[in-house]
Amino acid sequence: MSKAFQESEIRFNNLSEEALEFFVEHGYVVLDSVFGVEEMDESNQVLEEMRKRYAGDMGLDLESYDERICQWRDMWMTEPQFDELLRDNRLIQAAQFFMRQPSIQLIHDHVIRKPFSALNSTIPWHQDYPFWPVDTPDALSTWTPMEDVTTSGGCLEVVDKSHKWGVSPPVDFIMDPMDFSERKDVIRIPVKKGSMVVLHSLTWHRTNPNEDKGTNRPAHISLWVPSFARYRPDLSDWHPVNDHITVEAGEHLNVDKFPRFGEFDESNAPSPNSDELHTGPLKLESTMDMFSATPRIAGHIHRIIGDNQRGLPVRKLVDYANDEEVRRVVFERSLEKGIISEDQEKWLEGIFERMLINSTAYLRHRARNVYNDAYAQWWFHVGVKWVELWDNLE
């Protein structure tokens, strides 16, 4: 039986012209053994200790935490081991080399785990650049696994040469997953721990579930732009990196939260790019999207419990999810309207529990469930029915 995908077999051992030509042509490149096995084991150990610490801070055991949380942002800001990794010349020089820029700037970094026995699903097809509030798509990301990753272990998949297609609006992981299953140019990239995949910011990519028993598939991802990139909040005003930006639109990113590497000559920087590079995410009042899921669900609950009629402001989702009386009222009123059945009480309680854990983890540690499953289940089984009911009353 033939595979439904191609497997990437081309590897490079150094920053060569051949490697650069491959990246320019295909939109990705694999560098073998950039970091040592012991270095990756140390980073993985730091990640485990951090997870235990965060779980304890939230009153959870590690198993329960791992069933709910799988992504941690801004690792370089909180963990010295990852700050050291991010500033390592092997990583910096690779990013500079493939971007063909002497000076580069970090957008953000994060770690994503896909443990076989816990939180483990598909991260849908997407390009990276449309999520970033900057004015140039000529950028890249690095993907470094801390364990060996096989073709069945949640490795990266790319659409070969798709960086040449141009910029698309940001993909909504909840409502609008892209489908490239019929394409013959989808390539899976198995890699050893410490190797590095470099992706152009316009290359379409995803990861499938990890099907390899006994593995966790932790990977460190860093995302980079040229230092001449300028702030464009109109392109991505919803992304969490905006929390760290202190400059005005059209200015270069502040270096305290977006560290710069390599000498930057601002006098030679190109003028601000005001082109409409993409139209931004499609946000509809009648549906759910990942770009505004948290305030949208808070708005649903605000109306379900009648706080809108009492003139009370909308509270944060974490406050609603942590309020037993709110959860009780939502269940009873949803049951009364025929939106859910009596035997779904525990199911709805589970939705609230997951939203509480997700919201708390993000507020405390900038950690989250990258799959948005609790938000999606709320919308498809509860939220959409309430919205239809309200629409019929108006």
Positions of predicted regions on the chain:
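Non-heme Fe(II)-dependent double-stranded beta-helix
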Residues: 2-26, 32-125, 130-133
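Non-heme Fe(II)/2-oxoglutarate
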Residues: 5, 203-204, 208-307, 311-320, ...
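Short, surface-exposed loop/helix-turn segments at secondary-structure junctions
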Residues: 125-127, 172-185, 214-216, 235-240
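Charged, low-complexity interaction regions
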Residues: 338-342
